[in-house]
Amino acid sequence: MSGYGDFLKGLLREPGAVSAPTPSSPALAAAIAAKVDPLQSGLVVELGAGTGVVTQALLDRGIAPERLIAVEYCAYFAGLLAQRFPGVTVVQGDAFAFERYLPAGSQIAAVVSGVPLLNFPLPRRRALITRALALQGPSGRFVQLSYGWRPPISSAFGIAPEKTIVWRNFPPAHIWTFTAQEQPVAQQAQAQRTAGWGRPAQALFRISPPTS
């Protein structure tokens, strides 16, 4: 089945678990993956991996499968991911609690998010981004896909994202890139205290492929 067909099937099976208007285009996926440095050591965490268009782009970018953790809320999409990317750790779970799926003491190179953050309250958006950045080194980044024309959190919070517009997608999309070095020290400390970092590695799991 095509990527769009898989997207529609997931939408019909679990309408409450799918928030994206359409699957990402290859051009958008490549632009997102280009924000991740494959030479930066550590895990790359993809939140809201969907049908795997961005997952494939990250692999094409040079991210080794064993370095990639894909978190997806929709059970059908998570099954597709497990089937298509056997070397990638696929987790069916909550992107806002992604830390619990990480091995204790893991180094994070980047977090890539396709979760529609503008659909969630501002405090949840801010907490997710600041926690994700706090878990990374100074070169870490949080890359957010959005179909809105405003960033998920404003520069008033002391974090000014870089903006990229991708026109070769329907609808046109924004990529907001937040870097760890921009985050105020006080926010980093608070995020580390509340992140739940260091959960057991057993929380990682691969799920079974979907049945037709």
Predicted regions and their residues:
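Conserved beta-strand signature within the Rossmann-like core of class I S-adenosyl-L-methionine
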Residues: 136-147
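Glycine-rich SAM-binding Motif I of class I
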Residues: 52-56
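SAM/dcSAM-binding transferase cores
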Residues: 7-10, 155-212
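Conserved SAM/SAH-binding beta-strand->alpha-helix loop
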Residues: 74
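Class I SAM-dependent methyltransferase Rossmann-like catalytic core
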Residues: 3-38
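A short glycine-rich, Lys/Arg-flanked "PGG" loop and its adjoining helix->strand segment in the class I
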Residues: 126-138
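Conserved class I S-adenosyl-L-methionine
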Residues: 41-50
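Conserved SAM-binding loop
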Residues: 81-82
